[in-house]
Amino acid sequence: MNISDNYMPVILDTILADTIVGCDLYIQNFVNGEIRYILYCNGTNTIRSEKIEELQKHKIEMLFIHKEDQNKYLKYVESSLKNIIRDNRINIIEKAQVVYQVAKNIMLDVFSDPRSGIHVYRAKNLVEATIDMIITNKNASLAIINILSFDYYTYSHSVNVAILGLLFSKYLGIKFEELNVLGTGLLFHDIGKTQIESEIINKKEKLNEKEFTRIKMHVELGANILTKVRDIGDVSLFPVRQHHEKCNGKGYPNRLQGDDIHKFGKIASIIDVYDALTTRRSYADAKKPFSALNIMKNEMEGSFDDELFTKFILFLGQRSEK
């Protein structure tokens, strides 16, 4: 194994002066043509401003950590996420990458313990930070969408749906306060799947009728979890309860039609299906955006709100033109 396989880069500007990162930080060097990693700051020590200034003086933009310490680093970054987002030295692509990695890390914890108030609090802070990034960076849409994972896991799908849904909602002109409420609902839209047997969730073949009936229960199971969590309002539950409802009344769990479905539920439905189609599954390759939209338009006719779906196509088209 190459020594580089044990390390991963982290952006220097995500390390704040006079803080304890919690994991060892290394500098990459070349000795006799070979890569070496030299310990620069012990994870239990405070990294002083002089050390950071020294690195900046030598044009060093990346430090390195052991891959096994990624979770520690992401927890550290999470605690200063809003500062990172507002730091003009960090470009939007790097900000998007940091936010996305932190988001996936949080949702892994959420799905392992969905009733934890601490994890919910972390997730809500993440939504606020993501909205902050989207609002303060005009090029956020292109940067963020380009780093979304193409591999389907329930936790990464939840992050994709939340981020893409927030970008689309900003495009629609939805205000900050509503974005916050909507983003929380989108992030937790599949939380009920934590209560479904893993063999059903991870099954590679088509589900039988009994299994499909069981997995449809994730909607109400998710709503039940969140109604018992403090600080999750009723409006945030619309994406959770209604992301499988269809405007033609053929969805579940309540076969709602048209305007009986809340706008946030309609948005969640579009984004949920689009992300599912454009991510790689064990039983299906990821579809290209145009192909996914074509399937949604022609093979799922009547499922989505016509006006919102048209605007979603325009939203994606606007992004691809930049």
Functional labels for PLM-detected ranges:
Residues 1-148, 152:
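Non-catalytic interface/linker regions that flank or bridge core catalytic/transmembrane domains
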Residues 101-322:
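Histidine- and acidic-residue-rich, metal-dependent catalytic cores
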